[in-house]
From Swiss-Prot:
This is Protein SHORT-ROOT 1. It comes from the Eukaryota. It comes from Oryza sativa subsp. japonica (Rice). Its main location: nucleus. Residues 183-601 form the GRAS domain. It is found in: Nucleus. Residues 12-69, 101-145, 165-185 are annotated as: Disordered.
Length: 602
C-alpha cells in the first residue's frame, strides 16, 4: 500500500509491551488494506511531528499550528512522519519513473501494513523551535495518562455518518459545481471527493479527532499510482498534512528541488510533446492564440508600406516555446520579400524559493533550437529568454525594450497560464497588471487560462485582502473547487495516457505540487490561484481592452485539432449569460469547460 505517511510511536521502552498489545488489536481491525507494493525506495526530508497529548480534552480543542490558535502545545508525545515514498508496482524506479519526489536516504524506514511498529525515542531537537507549532491530534477516547503512541482501533473505525460508494469509477462530468461539491459531497463512486471534503471540513472546524480518523482512512486508500480517486486522495492528503503542520512552503520547496534535480531538456521535451500528442489541453490554446496573432500581424503587413515588417511577441507563458514552431511555419509560407522579422521575448516566471538552474538550462537549449528552426524556415528571427523570480506583477515591462528603439512595427502579448502568477490582493494587483499590458499598446493580447475559481474571495472587491484568503470559509471554497478541477484534469490524463508512462507521471506530479501550493500555502504566497473566464473578461474590459472574436478559419483549425484526439473533448463558445459573452472559446472535457482561450485589442 502506498502511503503518504507512516505513524511511528515515540514512547519509552518501558511501554513496549502495552504498544504491542494495542498494535495487535489494531491489526485485527485493519483488513481492508489493498496490500503493500513490491518495489519502493527510501526518501529524505525533514521529519515532521504530530503532537499528541493524552490530556488535551477533546478533538475540538488544540494548541498551535496553522489552524490551532498559534500557541505551542505542551511537549508530551510526538508521532514522526516519514516523507513521501516513491513506489511503482514491480517496475524498478530507476527504469520506469525517472524523477523522484525526494532524494534517497538511508535514514528513513518503510513499515509495511500489519508489521509491528518499532518504538523510538525522539531526538532532543525533535520539538519544533523557531517555526510554526504543529497541531495537536488529541483523541477524547484516550484516558489521561495512558500515554500510548498508536491509534486506538475504536478511534480508527469507519465513520458511521459517511456513506461511501466504491462501486463505480469516478467521472469528472458528474462532479457538479464547485459550490455544490464543497457543500454536498461527491456523486456516486467519488469516494475520494467525499472523504477529502469531509476531512477539509473537519480541518476548518478544528475537530482534531475527526481529522485524525479521516486522515488515517485516506492514508490507507490513497496511492499516487492507483486510479484517479487514489491519486486525488494521495495528493490532496499531502496538501492537507502540509497545511496542518504549517509546512506548506517548505514542502513545496522540497518538491520543486526534486523536480529541478531531475529536469533536463530531453525530459522536458518528451513530456511536452507527449502531452500535445495525447491531449489537446495545451495545444488548444496554442492554435487559438497563434491564429489570432498571425491574423493581427497580417493585417498590419497589408496596411503598411513595402518595407520589411518587424513583429515582436512578448511571451508570458510556461509552455517552453512549444507554441511557436507552427507560427514560424505559417510566416515561412509567405514570399521572401513579405517574410517579416520576428522577435520573441519569453518571460520565464518562478516562485522566489524555487530552483531555477534546470529551467535556465532548458531555456538555453530551446533558444538555440528555435533559432536553428527559424533559419531552416527562412524567417529572420531573434529569441530572448528573461528569467523572473516572484510575482509577475513585479516584472518591469518597460525594461524589456519591446519596441526595440522604435523599430517594432507591431507588438503582440501572449499570456498562456501566466496571469495567475500575479497574486490577487487588496491592491488589485491583477487589475494593475492588466492595465500595464494596455500601456504597452499591443496590437493583440491573447489570454489562455484554465477555468477554475480558486481565489478565496471576490478579486474585484475593495475588501479583498491577502489575509482574507486564509479563513475557514475561504479554505473550504477553494478546496472544493480545486478538487473539482484537478479531478477533471486527472481523469483526462487517465483516459489519454497509457497506464505506465514517465510523461504522465511527470504531469501528475506537477499537478501534485500545484495542489500542495493551493491547499497548504497562504493565499498571499500561492501561485495557483486560477480564476474563471468571467473574472478575466471583466478585468480585461476594465483595463481598456475589447474582445476579438476568433475568425472562422481559426475555429475550424481548433475543431480539426480536437478531431485528432479521443472522444470527450469539445469546443464551446462563451455563454451569453455572463460578462465573458463573446470573449473566447472553451476547451471542454466531458462537457465540463476546463481551458479558456481569448483574444483582446486596445
Amino acid at each position: 500500500m502506498d502511503t503518504l505517511f507512516r505513524l511511528v510511536s515515540l514512547q519509552a521502552a518501558s511501554e513496549q509491551q502495552q504498544q504491542q498489545q494495542q498494535s495487535a488489536s489494531y491489526n485485527s481491525r485493519s483488513t481492508t488494506s489493498s496490500g503493500s507494493r513490491s518495489s519502493s525506495h527510501q526518501t529524505n526530508a525533514s521529519y515532521s511531528y504530530y503532537h499528541h497529548s493524552s490530556n488535551s480534552g477533546g478533538g475540538g480543542g488544540g494548541g498551535g499550528g496553522y489552524y490551532y490558535g498559534g500557541q505551542q502545545p505542551p511537549p508530551s508525545q510526538y508521532y514522526y512522519l516519514e516523507p513521501y515514498q516513491e513506489e511503482c508496482g514491480n517496475a524498478p524506479h530507476h527504469q520506469l519513473y525517472m524523477d523522484e519526489d525526494f532524494s534517497s536516504s538511508s535514514s528513513s524506514r518503510h513499515f509495511h501494513h500489519g508489521a509491528r511498529v518499532q518504538q523510538q525515542q525522539p531526538p532532543a531537537s525533535s520539538t519544533p523551535t523557531g517555526t510554526a507549532p504543529t497541531p495537536p491530534l488529541s483523541t477524547s477516547s484516550t484516558a489521561a495518562g495512558a500515554g500510548h503512541g498508536l491509534f486506538e482501533a475504536a478511534d480508527l473505525s469507519f465513520p458511521p455518518d459517511l456513506n461511501l460508494d466504491f462501486s463505480s469509477p469516478a467521472s469528472s462530468s458528474g462532479g457538479g459545481t464547485a459550490s455544490s461539491g464543497a457543500v454536498g459531497g461527491g456523486g456516486g463512486g467519488r469516494w475520494a471527493s467525499q472523504l477529502l471534503l469531509e476531512c477539509a471540513r473537519s480541518v476548518a472546524a478544528r475537530d482534531s479527532q475527526r481529522v485524525q480518523q479521516l486522515m488515517w482512512m485516506l492514508n490507507e486508500l490513497a496511492s499516487p499510482y492507483g486510479d484517479v480517486e487514489q491519486k486525488l486522495a494521495s495528493y490532496f492528503l499531502q496538501g492537507l498534512f502540509a497545511r496542518l503542520t504549517a509546512s506548506g512552503p517548505r514542502t513545496l520547496r522540497t518538491l520543486a528541488a526534486a523536480s529541478d534535480r531531475n529536469t533536463s531538456f530531453d525530459s522536458t521535451r518528451r513530456t511536452a510533446l507527449r502531452f500535445q500528442e495525447l491531449s489537446p489541453w495545451s495545444s488548444f490554446g496554442h492554435v487559438a492564440a497563434n491564429g489570432a496573432i498571425l491574423e493581427s500581424f497580417l493585417e498590419v503587413a497589408a496596411a503598411a508600406s513595402s518595407e520589411t515588417q518587424r513583429f515582436h511577441i512578448l511571451d508570458l507563458s510556461n509552455t517552453f516555446c512549444t507554441q511557436w514552431p507552427t507560427l514560424l511555419e505559417a510566416l515561412a509560407t509567405r514570399s521572401a520579400d513579405e517574410t517579416p522579422h520576428l522577435s520573441i521575448t519569453t518571460v520565464v516566471s518562478a516562485a522566489p524559493s524555487a530552483p531555477t538552474a534546470a529551467v535556465q538550462r532548458v531555456m538555453r537549449e530551446i533558444g538555440q533550437r528555435m533559432e536553428k528552426f527559424a533559419r531552416l524556415m527562412g524567417v529572420p528571427f531573434r529569441f530572448r529568454a528573461v528569467h523572473h523570480s516572484g510575482d509577475l506583477a513585479e516584472l518591469d515591462l518597460d525594461a524589456l525594450d519591446l519596441r526595440e528603439g522604435g523599430a517594432t512595427t507591431a507588438l503582440a502579448v501572449n499570456c498562456v497560464n501566466s496571469l495567475r502568477g500575479v497574486v490577487p490582493g487588496r491592491a488589485r494587483r491583477r487589475d494593475a497588471f492588466a492595465a500595464s499590458l494596455r500601456r504597452l499598446d499591443p496590437r493583440v493580447v491573447t489570454v489562455v487560462e484554465e477555468e477554475a475559481d480558486l481565489v478565496a474571495s471576490d478579486p474585484d472587491a475593495s475588501s479583498a485582502t491577502e489575509e482574507g484568503g486564509d479563513t475557514e470559509a475561504a479554505f473550504l471554497k477553494v478546496f472544493g473547487e480545486g478538487l473539482r478541477f484537478f479531478s477533471a484534469y486527472m481523469d483526462s490524463l487517465e483516459e489519454s495516457f497509457p497506464k505506465t508512462s514517465n510523461e504522465r507521471l511527470a504531469l501528475e506530479r506537477g499537478a501534485g505540487r500545484a495542489i500542495v501550493d493551493l491547499v497548504s500555502c497562504p493565499a498571499s504566497e500561492s501561485m495557483e490561484r486560477r480564476e474563471t473566464a468571467a473574472s478575466w473578461a471583466r478585468r480585461m474590459r476594465s483595463a481598456g481592452f475589447s474582445p476579438v472574436a476568433f475568425s472562422e478559419d481559426v475555429a475550424d483549425d481548433v475543431r480539426s485539432l480536437l478531431r485528432r484526439y479521443r472522444e470527450g473533448w469539445s469546443m464551446r463558445e462563451a455563454g451569453t449569460d455572463d460578462s465573458a459573452a463573446g470573449a473566447g472559446v472553451f476547451l471542454a472535457w466531458k462537457e465540463q469547460p476546463l481551458v479558456w482561450a481569448s483574444a483582446w485589442r486596445p
